[in-house]
Amino acid sequence: IVTRFIEKPAPSEVFSDLANTGIYIFEPEILSMIPDYMPYDFSNDLFPRLLNEGIRIFTTEASGYWSDIGDIEQYAATQADMLDGKCAFETTAKSDGQGIFIEESARIGKRAVITAPCYIGANAEIADNAYFGGYSVACSGVRIGKNSSVKRCILLPEVRVREGAELRGAVLCERVQVEDGASIFEKAAIGAESVLE
């Protein structure tokens, strides 16, 4: 039973090593307490109200990996944890046992350089003389052109990285196109279908 609740406490306010992961089951009468047509946050509004009114909140403690991926840095860190084997993930990719995961339908140029840890998705292509790896993820259908270099990046489906491009520490959403010789650096997050020259 929850007796106290603080959403995202400062280090000096922490009183437990448990976290609210945002998975809830409510009785219908609890949902009726939520006002219509106005912002109302479970953690900041509903839970304090329930505790103040003496309504019991029950919990269950789950084991395993959990990460709050509310910003780009934490999203990238969680991807890195997956590549490092700190949390399980399902894949049909073949592993070399050293941290390189490649889906069977991916195509890798003979002179491409692939370094661990990384994941190369279904139907992805990495051209000759391209570098890919060092905590990078290429989702399905990604194309990386000749003489391009991709390190510490997450490339969502159908991203196109043209010849001679350089990417470092970025997240590229679906169908982004990076033109010849373009550069993208640390902490960049590029929206879906953007074109970078």
Q: Where are the predicted features?
A:
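Structural signal for interior beta-strand "rungs" in well-ordered beta-sheet cores
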Residues: 94-197
